[in-house]
């Protein structure tokens, strides 16, 4: 049982890996022998976090705005050109927006849905070949989407697009879990909060 959760030698990509939950996940991976790529829209912050985590193992910074499909394509190319496998994808990058109901702006929906839902779907789609080839029946690849309790219940804050986006992530996770299981890819979500 001592190797029940052994992840040494795996390769992971953690989006939004420069701070918060993403940084904690990346740190856990690096400290347990996982070659870990992290992304963030903020280049300097991403580079500094990768440098900090590299004290414990291998951590590579790939600054990326996942709402920009050209940048996403560059990220995918970077992974595919440098790795033979990608065992774990953590979709953690996210955005929130708060404003009163009567003045909640359209761009508050666009930014949040583009980051929290659309980018997750398209990143999985673009990485599907390497994820599929990295898994097998006994050790599938893993995709973990970071949802939120705000996507399950009613939040106190006036963040209308955020809970809607997290509810969408929970549902997208169920759909993808069903569709990708036969391709040796497990898809799950967690709901922090």
Roles of regions detected by a PLM:
Residues 2, 104, 154-163, 175:
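Active-site loop-to-helix junction immediately N-terminal to the catalytic Tyr of the SDR YXXXK motif
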Residues 11, 18-19:
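Conserved glycine-rich cofactor-binding loop
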Residues 43-44, 63-74, 106:
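The beta1-alpha1 cofactor-binding region of Rossmann-like NAD(H)/NADP(H)-dependent oxidoreductases
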Residues 124, 165, 173:
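Active-site helix of classical SDR
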Residues 129, 178-179:
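Alpha-helical segment proximal to the catalytic Tyr-Lys
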């Amino acid at each position: 049982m001592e190797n029940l959760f052994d992840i040494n030698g795996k390769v992971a990509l953690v989006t939004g890996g420069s701070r918060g939950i993403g940084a904690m996940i990346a740190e856990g991976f690096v400290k347990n022998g996982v070659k870990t790529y992290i992304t963030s829209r903020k280049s300097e912050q991403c580079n500094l976090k990768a440098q900090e985590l590299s004290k414990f193992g291998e951590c590579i910074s790939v600054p990326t705005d996942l709402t920009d499909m050209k940048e996403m394509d560059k990220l995918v190319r970077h992974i595919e050109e440098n790795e033979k496998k990608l065992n774990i994808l953590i979709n953690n990058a996210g955005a929130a927006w708060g404003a009163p109901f009567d003045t909640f702006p359209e761009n508050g929906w666009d930014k949040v849905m583009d980051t929290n839902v659309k980018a997750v779907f398209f990143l999985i789609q673009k990485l599907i070949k390497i994820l599929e080839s990295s898994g097998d029946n006994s050790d599938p690849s893993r995709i973990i989407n970071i949802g939120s309790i705000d996507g399950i219940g009613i939040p106190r804050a006036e963040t209308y697009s955020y809970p809607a986006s997290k509810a969408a992530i929970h549902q997208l996770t169920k759909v993808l879990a069903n569709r990708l299981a036969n391709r040796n890819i497990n898809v799950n979500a967690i709901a922090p909060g």
